[in-house]
C-alpha cells in the first residue's frame, strides 16, 4: 500500500496541527495546503513557532517558491484559493482533504472539494448533515461509498469513548456533561461584539464564560443507544489549551466507584488503547499538553454519591488529541477502500 496523500484546507490551529501529525507519520504524506488569507512565507512562520506545542524541530522548513513549502526535502504545494471547488487537489495528488476552515461544515459546501479532484473530505468540526465518526466508538460503521464525513468535535471525542465504556458495562439512564474548556480562536481578547452569544463576546483571558455546546447531544449521533439521554454545557476558562469533561450520570446496573474505575482501566489497556487513557496521579491541565489520546480518565477526581449516581472526570488536549484523531479517521477510511 502506498502512502495516504492528504491536503489541508484552512491553516488555523487544527490545520497546522494536523500537518504536524501527518509530517510525523510514516504512512501519511502531506501534499498540499490551501489558505487564501496567509502568504506562503507567513505559513512557514506560523507552522514553525507554536505558543502551546512548541517549535517544530522534526525537519527544516523552508520556502522553495511562492507556491511550495519544503519540509526537509519534502515539497508541499500551497494554494491561496477562496472557493473550494477551484482548488486543484487532484493536480497536487491530494486524495483526502481535511476541511479545517470552520466554514464549509455541511455536506454541500464540503462536497466542493470533490470537484477539484479530492476523493474524500474529513470535516474537522461537527456537521449538521455529514455522518459523524469518533475513532474508538463508531468508525466501524463507515462504508467506503461515503465521501464526506465529520470527525465531530474535540469534546465529543473525549466524551463518547467514556460514555461508551460506562454504557456498555453499566447502562446509562441519563446524564449531564460539563466541559471546562480552554480558550479557542473564536473568542475575544477584549470585550467585543458577539451578537449571537453576548457572553461569548467578553474578554477570554479575564473571565469564566458559560457557553452552549452540542458535544453531549452529538454523542447520540455516534452512539444511537444514548440518543436523548445526554446533554451538556461548557465553561470557557482562561487557559490556552487542554480541557476537561465532567460527566454526571445515573446508571442502571449498580456499581461501586472502584468497579467503574476497573472497567475504564480495562478499556484503556484493551479495545480503546491509544484513545482512552487512565491516570491515578495528581495531575493538572498542563500535564496533558501534547497528549495524543482523546480522553484521559482521572480516577482520583471522580466521585460517587451511591452505586447508581456518579461523576466522572476526563481530560483532553483539545488541539493535539483531536488532530491525531483526524488523521486516524483518514487512516481508517483508507483501509476501508
From Swiss-Prot:
Pathway: Carbohydrate degradation; glycolysis; pyruvate from D-glyceraldehyde 3-phosphate: step 1/5. It is found in: Cytoplasm. One of its GO terms (cellular component) is cytosol. The active site is at 154 (nucleophile). Keywords: Cytoplasm, Glycolysis, NAD, Oxidoreductase. PROSITE patterns: GAPDH (PS00071). It catalyses: D-glyceraldehyde 3-phosphate + phosphate + NAD(+) = (2R)-3-phospho-glyceroyl phosphate + NADH + H(+). Belongs to the glyceraldehyde-3-phosphate dehydrogenase family. Homotetramer. PANTHER family: GLYCERALDEHYDE 3-PHOSPHATE DEHYDROGENASE, GLYCERALDEHYDE-3-PHOSPHATE DEHYDROGENASE 1, CYTOSOLIC. NCBIfam families: GAPDH-I (TIGR01534). This is Glyceraldehyde-3-phosphate dehydrogenase 2, cytosolic. It comes from Zea mays.
